[in-house]
């Protein structure tokens, strides 16, 4: 059975509370439940983690080397400047899909530049929580 690591960066735990006009009303628990149900449907195993700490995200990426078949990552604000997360993604050589709930390319100019995406197979943005499901489908098929 394939195993996928789902990593969520800073403030994703605040879904349903912060900027509902941008991120919607679903909570982080709702997102995790959606991911678990999708994993069951796809017959894959998922591990879901969230941290506001860049170093913790790097640690989880490194730990999963040779242990998972894919990574779904929403680096949050770290997307725009974390060379550490980029380097970690590149070092483990695991297919990764970067997900953003909002369309970061239609938001503030500083959000248009994505550093971490270069370490990923692809990026899904602007499709709400459905982006996570699409990423899981893609990685389950690899």
Task: Describe the residue ranges of each PLM region.
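Short beta->alpha junction loops
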Residues: 47-55
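Glycine- and acidic-residue-enriched helix-capping/strand-helix junction motifs
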Residues: 15-29
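Short acidic/histidine-rich motifs immediately flanking catalytic phosphotransfer sites
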Residues: 64-71
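Helix-loop-strand module that forms the ligand-binding subsite of alpha/beta enzymes
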Residues: 73-111
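Extreme N-terminal starter segment of soluble prokaryotic enzymes
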Residues: 1-4
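Short acidic active-site motifs
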Residues: 56-60
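Short, glycine-/small-residue-rich phosphate/pyrophosphate-handling segment
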Residues: 97, 105-142
């Amino acid at each position: 059975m394939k195993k996928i690591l789902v990593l969520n960066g800073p403030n994703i735990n605040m879904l349903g509370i912060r900027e509902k006009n941008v991120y919607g009303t679903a909570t982080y628990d709702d997102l995790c439940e959606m991911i678990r149900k999708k994993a069951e449907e796809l017959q894959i195993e998922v591990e879901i983690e969230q941290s506001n700490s860049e170093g913790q995200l790097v640690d989880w990426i490194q730990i999963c080397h040779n242990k998972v078949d894919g990574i779904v990552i929403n680096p949050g604000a770290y997307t725009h400047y974390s060379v550490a997360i980029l380097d970690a993604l590149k070092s483990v050589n695991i297919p990764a899909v970067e997900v953003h709930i909002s369309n970061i390319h239609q938001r503030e100019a500083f959000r248009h530049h994505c550093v971490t995406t270069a370490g990923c197979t692809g990026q899904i943005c602007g499709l709400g929580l459905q982006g996570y499901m699409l990423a899981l489908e893609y990685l389950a098929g690899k």
